[in-house]
Each structure stands twice: as C-alpha cells, then as structure tokens.
Amino acid sequence: MVQYELWAALPGASGVALACCFVAAAVALRWSGRRTARGAVVRARQRQRAGLENMDRAAQRFRLQNPDLDSEALLALPLPQLVQKLHSRELAPEAVLFTYVGKAWEVNKGTNCVTSYLADCETQLSQAPRQGLLYGVPVSLKECFTYKGQDSTLGLSLNEGVPAECDSVVVHVLKLQGAVPFVHTNVPQSMFSYDCSNPLFGQTVNPWKSSKSPGGSSGGEGALIGSGGSPLGLGTDIGGSIRFPSSFCGICGLKPTGNRLSKSGLKGCVYGQEAVRLSVGPMARDVESLALCLRALLCEDMFRLDPTVPPLPFREEVYTSSQPLRVGYYETDNYTMPSPAMRRAVLETKQSLEAAGHTLVPFLPSNIPHALETLSTGGLFSDGGHTFLQNFKGDFVDPCLGDLVSILKLPQWLKGLLAFLVKPLLPRLSAFLSNMKSRSAGKLWELQHEIEVYRKTVIAQWRALDLDVVLTPMLAPALDLNAPGRATGAVSYTMLYNCLDFPAGVVPVTTVTAEDEAQMEHYRGYFGDIWDKMLQKGMKKSVGLPVAVQCVALPWQEELCLRFMREVERLMTPEKQSS
C-alpha cells in the first residue's frame, strides 16, 4: 500500500527511479541474506579440495614406498577374501587402506562422490583391533554419519563448519570391529531426494555414465562403491535412499527394519518424524559383503552403546540355510509402470528361481496408492513441511529439490485449492498436495494408527499365502541428472517398504539391452502425467546400464532377506560366486 501511494505521488521519471530503487533494494537484501550461504560454499569446497589433496599425497607416498604392490589384484578381491588375507597377515592393513584411498581419489575425479577425507584413518590403523570381523577394512560413510571432528553438512550451509563432537554409534562399532572409516560421501541437499546434488559440493554423477544420476540420497556411496573406490559403505534409507543408488550404480544394498541398526548420532534435517521409519544399512559389491557388515554390527558393543536397539545378533543358521523358498512376486505395482528392463529382470529372475527348485506365487500388497499418497506422504510432511523448510533459511535451494521446496512453501489453503484444481488431470499430484498439509496431533495419531493397520493387513496377506520372501521390480535404469526431482511417483517400489518397515535389498541381475531401449519408446506409464513423461524421458540412452530386482522379507528377518538376495545373485550373476 505504501509503495502504491509513493508511486502515484511521483510522475514519470521519478516513478521509474523509485521502482528501480525498490528492485535494487530487493536484490541487495537477497544478496545480503545469501552472504552466509556463499561463504559456506567457499569453505566447504576448500575443505573438500584440501582433503582430496591429502588423499593423493598419502596414496602416492605409499606407492613410492611399496612399488611392487599389485594394486589391481588387491582392488579386485571380494571383501570376504580381503578380510581373510588381512587376518592371516598376507596383506597389511596399510596396503589395503592406501590402495583404496588412491582409488577413491582417482574415481572421484569422474564422479565427485567424496566430500571429506577422514585423515585420522591413518592413525586409526594402529588402533584397529586385530580380532575384529572387519579388521583393516576401509569403509566409506554417507555424510550424515557423524565422525568426530568432521562436518556432516547434508549439503546445507547452516551445518558447514560445525564439526561433530563424537562418532555416531555405528561408526564407533565399526572401529571396534577393526574397520577403518576413510571418507565421507556426497548426498542431495537435505537428503530428501533420490538424485545427488547440493550447493556445497555440487553434483555427483553415475560411474557408468556421467549424464545419469547415481541415485540418492546415498548417491555418493553408490558412485564410490560402484566405481571400485570402496569395498564397503554405510547408507541410510527413508524412501529408497540405499536402494536407488545401489540399483543405479550396479551394486548391492540392504535397507533393514528401522530399528535393527543404531541411528544414534546420525545427522538429519527433520527429527521426531516416526510415522515412516529411517533405516541404516550396508552397501557393497556383493551380498556376502552386506552379510559380513551386518554380522559385525549386530554385536554386544552396539547393544551396549545403544540400548534402544533390540539385542538380536546375526542368525547364521537362517542366512546359510539351503531350504527351498516360497517366493511371492509381482511384475508391477500398477502405480509406476515398470520399464521394459525392469519387467524383464523380474521375469528372468522368477524363471531362474523356479528352475532352482523354489516356488513362485503371484502376490501384490493391497492399496498401494493409499500407502504412498496418504500414509507415507502424510507421515513425512505431517507439519506441512515447516520443520524441513527451516533448514533452507538464507540458503540456496538445489535444483533437485526445487519443486518440493516450492510446493511446501505454499500456504495451506493454496495447497488445498491446487489439489482440487489439478485432480481431474493430475490425480497423483493432487493426492500428494492434499497430504502435504499440516495436521493436528489428533490427526497425526489417526494417521499413525492407519499405518499400523495397513502393516497388519499386508502381513496377513503375506501369511495367507505362506510366503517366505517377496520379489519385486526395482526402479531402473538410472535416470538423467535432475530427472528424479520431477518423477516423484517412481518412488513407489521402494517407499512402500519404508511405510511397512519391512527389510528390503536390491541385487543387480542384468543390464539394459537395445531391445529394452527400443520398447521404452512406447512407454506411457499408467497415468500419462508429468511424472510418467519425465520417467520415460529420463530413462533414454541407457543401453548397458545395470538393472536390479528388489528382495523383501517380513520385519526383523534381515538374515532371510540376505539369504534370498544371495540366491538371486548366485543364479543371475554366477561370476560373483566364482570370484
């Protein structure tokens, strides 16, 4: 009102001058507000460069001192064999660490996956307990795992320059088991994306093809492990954040039941949200490495350091069983149309399992749209996104989050109005908008009760068919960079099992063929909406990229899930078994 009156009082050139002043003032305010964020970007990238230089120097120094070491042979060793050679002293832990430090430095040049070098790994070697199950094993960490003296930024400027006071529990347990954490890896800003880019460290790219996303939010882990720069990593998963990068980068990953592994000490941007459970899980080149990691973490040390974790040690007899399995399966969830390669991967895996003596039974959890649109979205954004948005004050918003942040910033009434207006043409977007509104405590309790009822319903369906495990499609191949943020509906295959809190893992089983690529030209999706169109566009030019399937078990049955994953791996990629 004041601006309008001033404008009316000043004719001609004076009015134009005043308008220019207003614009200049707005720009100046915006520039001033972003000063802190710009400084954080500069400091973060300086720290990243310094860490990478230290990695290069350490690796080169070791190579000069040990010119006869066969680095390629060491890097090719599967993790179980690597551990065996470390325990037998056939390999020195220094040789393993600095070989992987050098490899991580090398692959980072093409992927931008490493954010920090955990330089005390060099002194950690002398402290690593020789009897530990992971003695001498270099381990990479998603940046959200706090590490004493290191920032865990999540790509947000407010977290830059705030080093952790202590290690998170799982990092502490890794060290007690002899492992040597050596790098932090990149994440999408806030970790609420299945792409991998942020203003502090930039875009991480897929090691198979640089125009493709590595997935997210554990995308740095996927890129590093997928390119051979780490034998084992830890990620987190609240909507597919371990499984997307594992699928896109051609590695294995496990999302356990939410509370099977400790989350104490993890850095996050929203605390207290319990409707959809976050999980901590391992990522590696093969299933046996995942099992080894879980075996090491499920120990008395973790149960002592975090008494809220159920004291359930790894059940070896379940993992090593060879009894035939009764496997439920579905080719599609009827929400996200599978790509031709996804459907083929499930059918070929089904045929191989049947040929090996397992029983395959059609199965599809009920009411998947409700689980995704109402239960999951409503649970994640039950405060209307208010807490989430607090992290972005004065900060840049990465393009991978642009649409989400813009929607969450809308007033409650406008979200409702838009949901009503777009419903005839975009029913999925309408449903997501409706459930991104804030709700009262009473309504939140109702939602959480609905989730419990839904979980019991699916378990009853599962048990009615006497299933051991379930085989499902996994989103693949990798999407183009920046496409995940505009293909939100494609989280359906993974998000369902966060809502249900079932353990789920992914195993690569094939690659995209020229025939798959040709068939993708006819892909329209089930709704033909903007998400389906982006998915079709984002999956083009993918011949040769990895394709995975998802393996699911009931809550607390991680060992059975891993056993099923190992069987799929044995049948579909026998070269891993022979190595």
UniProtKB/Swiss-Prot annotation:
Where Phosphoserine occurs, the residues are 241
Coiled coil regions, renumbered to chain: none
Q: Which residues cross the membrane?
A: 9-29
Which GO BP annotation is one of this protein's?
arachidonate metabolic process
Q: Tissue-wise, where is it found?
A: Highly expressed in the brain, small intestine, pancreas, skeletal muscle and testis. Also expressed in the kidney, liver, lung, placenta and prostate.
Q: How does it sit in the membrane?
A: Single-pass membrane protein
Q: Which residues form the active site?
A: 142, 217, 241
Query: What GO molecular functions are on record for this protein?
Result: amidase activity; fatty acid amide hydrolase activity; identical protein binding; monoacylglycerol lipase activity; phospholipid binding
Q: Which residues lie within the membrane without crossing it?
A: 404-433
Q: What is its main location?
A: membrane
Q: Does the entry feature the keyword Cytoplasm, yes or no? A: yes
Gene Ontology CC terms: cytoskeleton; endoplasmic reticulum membrane; glutamatergic synapse; organelle membrane; postsynapse; presynapse
Q: What class of enzyme is it?
A: hydrolase
Q: What pH dependence is recorded for this entry?
A: Optimum pH is around 9.0.
Q: So which stretches are on the Cytoplasmic side?
A: 30-403, 434-579
Under catalytic activity, the entry for this protein gives:
N-(5Z,8Z,11Z,14Z-eicosatetraenoyl)-ethanolamine + H2O = ethanolamine + (5Z,8Z,11Z,14Z)-eicosatetraenoate; (9Z)-octadecenamide + H2O = (9Z)-octadecenoate + NH4(+); 2-(5Z,8Z,11Z,14Z-eicosatetraenoyl)-glycerol + H2O = glycerol + (5Z,8Z,11Z,14Z)-eicosatetraenoate + H(+); N-(9Z-octadecenoyl) ethanolamine + H2O = ethanolamine + (9Z)-octadecenoate
Q: How does it assemble?
A: Homodimer.
Task: State the family named in the UniProt similarity comment for this chain.
Answer: Belongs to the amidase family.
Q: What is this protein called?
A: Fatty-acid amide hydrolase 1
User: Could you tell me the gene encoding this protein?
Assistant: FAAH
